[in-house]
């Protein structure tokens, strides 16, 4: 999932090496470095209008922690400190650090008292209804979020959601995201989009939120930002959030940071990746290869052991009737030197965005063979 431009991409490697030979990095707390500044500007050029201010950290989990801190602090600066609730969807995944992991479990279910307070998970999309109604029109399941906002809206700091859930590869319907955006606006809460997995081309668009034609208040990206070559994450905020922090003179901006935040060599990698995505026709090719992959793998759709195939760009999930079936398919592919991800009873495809057509066809052929073998067991 990380190697979005494959291995040993010379444009990215050369950019990293060139930066290492000049200055590996420089502290961002009281200073800065040119690659970080340039990358922040470059991100502002490809995100939705208003998303112009970026804070760099080192991983998706750190990005989640940062976004939560920004959201809560924003409301406190506006003397709205009762807004502390962070709302997420059940069965989500946002990372393994303290607040990030609590998003997936909620404070209420913490019987041992180990997790921080103020986190609530609500039921998400009704996936069975989404299957029946179709991804393009469904917003089934939004009722649970509407009820929670109606009951607790004045206490909600932010709602955080992945446009495509990393666990299982479930695509959150565009209408659901639009309704969530409207709820956040209506009740004065922030919409935080976790695009750690989907950001920078994975779905065939630069960002997955483009499918729903919405703009988040905070956007978190990581994996595709450097294509896995260096550890880097970005929290990009809307101007309206930045302006509140800038007006608070005693804060001197956003008081937050890590030793390697905005690492210059990592940001150099990010600049090279963005250049490739924008100038080498990658996104258009992802759309074309997505069609090929979906049609090829779709040959197993009528197999009795296959429950559903979900695909957006070069991110595909094939759901089987059991975890054991998925394990068997993964082992068969590994035995044939194909590395693939399994999540529960789902097999997840996330090949490099610049993969060759021949490799896509080979991957699909080997997968169909694995399905035939596993289905006969």
Q: What are these language model-derived features?
A:
Residues 1-377:
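Conserved N-terminal phosphate-binding loop of PLP-dependent enzymes in the Aspartate aminotransferase
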């Amino acid at each position: 999932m990380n190697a979005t431009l494959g291995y040993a991409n010379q444009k990215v490697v050369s950019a990293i090496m060139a930066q290492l030979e000049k200055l590996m990095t420089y502290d961002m707390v009281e200073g800065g470095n040119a690659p970080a500044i340039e990358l922040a500007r470059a991100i502002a050029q490809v995100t939705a209008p208003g998303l112009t201010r970026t804070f760099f950290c080192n991983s998706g989990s750190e990005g989640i922690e940062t976004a939560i801190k920004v959201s809560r602090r924003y409301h406190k600066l506006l003397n709205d400190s009762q807004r502390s609730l962070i709302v997420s969807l059940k069965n989500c995944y946002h990372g393994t650090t303290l607040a990030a992991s609590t998003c997936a479990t909620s404070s209420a279910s913490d019987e041992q008292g180990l997790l921080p307070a103020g986190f609530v998970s609500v039921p998400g999309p009704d996936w069975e209804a989404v299957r029946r109604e179709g991804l393009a029109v469904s917003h089934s399941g939004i009722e649970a979020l509407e009820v929670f906002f109606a009951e607790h809206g004045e206490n909600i700091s932010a709602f955080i959601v992945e446009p495509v859930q990393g666990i299982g590869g479930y695509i959150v319907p565009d209408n659901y995201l639009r309704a969530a955006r409207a709820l956040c606006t209506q009740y004065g809460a922030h919409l935080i989009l976790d695009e750690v997995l989907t950001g920078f081309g994975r779905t065939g668009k630069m960002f997955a939120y483009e499918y729903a034609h919405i703009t988040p208040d905070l956007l978190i990206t990581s994996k595709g930002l450097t294509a896995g070559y260096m550890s880097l994450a970005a929290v990009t905020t809307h101007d309206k959030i930045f302006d509140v922090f800038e007006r608070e003179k005693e804060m001197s901006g956003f008081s937050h940071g890590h030793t390697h935040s905005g690492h210059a060599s990592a940001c150099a990698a990010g600049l090279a990746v963005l250049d490739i995505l924008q100038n080498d026709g990658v996104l258009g090719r992802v759309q074309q290869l997505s069609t090929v992959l979906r049609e090829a793998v779709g040959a197993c759709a009528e197999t009795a052991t296959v429950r559903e195939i979900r695909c957006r760009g070069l991110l595909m999930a094939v759901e089987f009737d059991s975890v054991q079936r998925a394990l068997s398919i993964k082992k068969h592919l590994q035995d044939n030197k194909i590395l693939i991800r399994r999540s529960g009873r789902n097999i997840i495809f996330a090949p490099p965005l610049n993969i060759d057509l021949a490799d896509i066809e080979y991957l699909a052929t080997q997968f169909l063979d694995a399905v035939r073998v596993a289905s006969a067991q």
